């Protein structure tokens, strides 16, 4: 979301607009005309974290009387909402497919997920909501089906790619990158890009390459990374599953790969698809 917001700020940067960002923390670029409001109240758990930020952010924008509030979080009272994560209940349904029945029941009973679904419904039913932006027709249909929102309030705007930046590599670049990261030049390497390994299907990706001679290049982070490393070890493919962590520049990793492997459970129009295609994967 931060990368999207940074790009949106760049596009909207104008002397005719006063741009404000309300966030828990900001690590992106800052321009003199941008106002960054750090809003990070004390928290005691996941629900407290979400509810505290929502209440504090709403209080701030009401106090400042902004002309237009676009939110990337499920906060009732915003004018525009970008549904980049889709519909939470639909994500839980997809997640439950890979869980035992008893875990699936616990998933929908979980207090945190119930809070998120309640906040989402309150946001869609709030009279202040003037429009919703989503990046896939699937999400538009799900919002209409789950919340009864009018179709003319929902705008599908597809993700874009800078194809002057994301390019296929030349032979020399490809060979140099393979040598730098100690990957065999002739090996078939599949890249996986994304954080939140469960949602993005990393376990399925590891199991898919295990019985082959393919390499899997994992770019992203997750607090449960050791569990996925243990899975690779148990399948005797740990030498071919390389974890590179979070990378501020992903281009070199696309350029040294042969293909993209992203068996994600629920991920509307992920940017990595466009980035990989632009790099010739």
Descriptions of predicted regions:
Residues 260-261, 276:
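A short hydrophobic beta-strand element within the catalytic core of glycosyltransferases
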């Amino acid at each position: 979301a931060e990368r999207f917001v940074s790009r949106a700020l760049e596009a909207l940067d104008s002397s005719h607009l006063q741009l404000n960002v309300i966030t828990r923390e900001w690590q992106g670029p800052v321009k003199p005309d941008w106002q960054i409001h750090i809003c990070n109240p004390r928290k005691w758990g996941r629900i407290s974290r979400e509810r505290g930020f929502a209440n504090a952010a709403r209080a701030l924008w009401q106090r400042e009387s902004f002309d237009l509030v676009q939110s990337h979080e499920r906060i009732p009272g915003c004018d525009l909402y970008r549904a980049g994560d889709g519909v939470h209940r639909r994500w839980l349904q997809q997640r439950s497919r890979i869980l035992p029945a008893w875990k699936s029941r616990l998933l929908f009973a979980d207090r945190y997920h119930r809070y998120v679904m309640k906040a989402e419904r309150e946001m869609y039913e709030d009279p202040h909501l003037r429009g919703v932006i989503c990046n896939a027709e699937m999400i538009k249909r799900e919002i209409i089906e789950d919340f009864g929102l009018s179709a003319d309030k929902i705008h599908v705007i597809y993700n874009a790619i800078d194809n002057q930046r994301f390019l296929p590599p030349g032979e020399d670049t490809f060979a140099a990158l393979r040598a730098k990261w100690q990957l065999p030049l002739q090996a078939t390497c599949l890249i996986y890009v994304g954080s939140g390994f469960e949602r993005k299907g990393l376990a399925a990706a590891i199991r898919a390459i295990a019985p082959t001679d393919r390499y899997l290049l994992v770019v992203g982070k997750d607090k449960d990374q050791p569990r996925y490393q243990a899975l690779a070890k148990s399948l005797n493919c740990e030498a071919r599953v390389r974890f590179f962590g979070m990378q501020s520049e992903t281009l070199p990793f696309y350029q040294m790969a042969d293909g993209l492997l992203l068996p994600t459970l629920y991920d509307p129009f992920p940017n990595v698809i466009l980035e990989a295609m632009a790099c010739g994967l």
